């Protein structure tokens, strides 16, 4: 689970303003950190299928936000992908 401090750090890193929580970049970065946390959780809890459903929903939401960002602001999309290390 993301702590309040981690969330503030992500918002400060990816946001355009100090309280920018609604931009696509910040939402994608927050989803990415939650997805990474859940992935670690599943290494220890392989049969937690209820949480797996939530993980799949988060991955799909991140995917749709990335598609939106790619359509609307390609330069910002490329920077975000590079910072998060999503594409290989």
UniProtKB/Swiss-Prot annotation:
The organism's place on the tree of life at top rank: Bacteria
One Pfam family matching this protein: Ribosomal_S15
Listed PANTHER family: RIBOSOMAL PROTEIN S15, BACTERIAL AND ORGANELLAR (PTHR23321), SMALL RIBOSOMAL SUBUNIT PROTEIN US15M (PTHR23321:SF26)
Protein's GO biological process: translation
Entry annotated with the keyword Aminoacyl-tRNA synthetase: no
Alphabetical UniProt keywords: Ribonucleoprotein, Ribosomal protein, RNA-binding, rRNA-binding
Gene: rpsO
InterPro entries recorded: Ribosomal_uS15 (IPR000589), Ribosomal_uS15_bac-type (IPR005290), uS15_NS1_RNA-bd_sf (IPR009068)
Subunit structure: Part of the 30S ribosomal subunit. Forms a bridge to the 50S subunit in the 70S ribosome, contacting the 23S rRNA.
GO cellular component: cytosolic small ribosomal subunit
Species this protein is from: Leptospira biflexa serovar Patoc (strain Patoc 1 / ATCC 23582 / Paris)
Name of this protein: Small ribosomal subunit protein uS15
Family: Belongs to the universal ribosomal protein uS15 family.
């Amino acid at each position: 689970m993301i702590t309040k401090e981690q969330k503030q750090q992500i918002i400060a890193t990816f946001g355009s303003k100090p309280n920018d929580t609604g931009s696509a970049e910040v939402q994608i970065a927050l989803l990415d950190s939650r997805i990474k946390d859940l992935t670690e959780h599943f290494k220890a809890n392989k049969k937690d299928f209820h949480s797996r459903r939530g993980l799949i929903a988060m991955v799909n939401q991140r995917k749709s936000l990335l598609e939106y960002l790619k359509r609307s602001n390609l330069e910002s999309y490329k920077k975000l992908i590079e910072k998060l290390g999503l594409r290989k």
